[in-house]
């Protein structure tokens, strides 16, 4: 019997700026409603979600706005629009939590990463987040630098 291969997610796009610019609250995993050429283009790993966000519309549906999935090069005239809004697939309870966080607490829905799960499905990790002020960003940088320095000191000591 063959050994199971490790279940490593293939990350298609990551929003590394989000953890710097926002205080990340609760995270959610959502499915993405994509066309065939979008899936193929995502597998190449050239998508960008740094400037994107998600929003809940009046019908209670969540859409990913401003994410760029470039056109698939090998596709013909039936290619997709690179910046079109894409529907996110979530449970009703999760959508209610997201809309409540946005309306009452003044938070935003930020995408953290797009990846393919072990079944090959495209998933997106989104989070309710609150924007950081400049002094909060500086404080985060100081903590990170101190942790690096502390690690160096401990490593050099031993």
Swiss-Prot record:
InterPro entries per the record? Answer: SmpB, SsrA-bd_prot, SsrA-bd_prot_CS
Q: Which SUPFAM superfamilies match?
A: Small protein B (SmpB)
Show the segment(s) annotated as Disordered.
Answer: 133-158
Provide the primary localization: cytoplasm
Enumerate the subcellular locations listed in this protein's record, separating them with semicolons: Cytoplasm
Provide the GO biological process annotations. Answer: trans-translation
NCBIfam families for this protein: PRK05422.1, smpB
- Record protein name field: SsrA-binding protein
Q: What is the lineage of its organism?
A: Bacteria, Pseudomonadati, Pseudomonadota, Alphaproteobacteria, Hyphomicrobiales
């Amino acid at each position: 019997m063959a050994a199971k291969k490790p279940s490593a997610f293939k990350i298609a796009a990551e929003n590394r700026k989000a953890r710097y610019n926002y205080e990340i609250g609760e995270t959610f995993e959502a499915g993405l409603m994509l066309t065939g050429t979008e899936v193929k283009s995502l597998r190449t790993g050239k998508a960008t979600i740094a400037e994107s966000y998600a929003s809940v519309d009046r019908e209670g549906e969540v859409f990913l706005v401003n994410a760029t999935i470039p056109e698939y090069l090998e596709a013909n005239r039936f290619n997709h629009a690179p910046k079109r809004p894409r529907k996110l697939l979530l449970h009703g309870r999760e959508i209610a939590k997201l809309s409540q966080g946005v309306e009452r607490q003044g938070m935003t829905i930020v995408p953290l990463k797009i990846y393919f799960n072990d079944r090959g499905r495209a998933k997106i990790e989104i989070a309710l987040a609150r924007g950081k002020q400049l002094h909060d960003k500086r404080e985060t940088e100081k903590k990170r630098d101190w942790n690096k320095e502390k690690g160096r000191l401990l490593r050099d000591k031993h």
